[in-house]
Amino acid sequence: MSRRHAAEKRVILPDMKYNSILLSRFINNIMKEGKKALAEKIVYSAFNKIEKKHRVDPYQTFNNAMHNVKPHLEVTSVRVGGANYQVPTHVDERRGYALASRWIINAASKRSEKMMIDKLAEELFEASNNRGVAIKKKEDTHKMAEANKAFSHFSPKKMK
């Protein structure tokens, strides 16, 4: 692994329908085995289902869900004197949204509905209303960071 310079961040184009880079990243996370058209179909169909069932703007619901699930703190493992400590660190915005989308997708796939469209629609709606498994995951992460607040003086190098 080269240490000369950091890798360049790829430019991700916004999605066609809502012109949003955040939604485009979410679609890329849904995508499996390069089947982007299928991932787009799942997301846009879930948006249609949200609009029909709950009579709310699906894009606004998506943004609210992502904002509600995005963590502000997480713990990173730091080795000090032969012992590993779970040190709470702040999460930057890009990583926060990446974690949020991953948690929403995992929570949706574990739901009991039959089709991924239904699962995703319900999980997004619940997350936008501060309910659901993805919100619980965020709260657990924050509790873990709060419990390990005593080790915050062992901040990792990236925080200095």
Curated annotation (Swiss-Prot):
Cytoplasm found in the keyword field: no
NCBIfam families per UniProt: rpsG_bact
Sequence similarity: Belongs to the universal ribosomal protein uS7 family.
Organism: Rickettsia africae (strain ESF-5)
Domain of life: Bacteria
Biological role: One of the primary rRNA binding proteins, it binds directly to 16S rRNA where it nucleates assembly of the head domain of the 30S subunit. Is located at the subunit interface close to the decoding center, probably blocks exit of the E-site tRNA.
Single GO biological process annotation from the record: translation
GO MF: rRNA binding; structural constituent of ribosome; tRNA binding
Quaternary state and interactors: Part of the 30S ribosomal subunit. Contacts proteins S9 and S11.
SUPFAM superfamilies: Ribosomal protein S7
Keywords linked to the UniProt accession: Ribonucleoprotein, Ribosomal protein, RNA-binding, rRNA-binding, tRNA-binding
Cellular component terms (Gene Ontology): small ribosomal subunit
Official protein name in the record: Small ribosomal subunit protein uS7
This protein's record includes keyword Ribosomal protein: yes
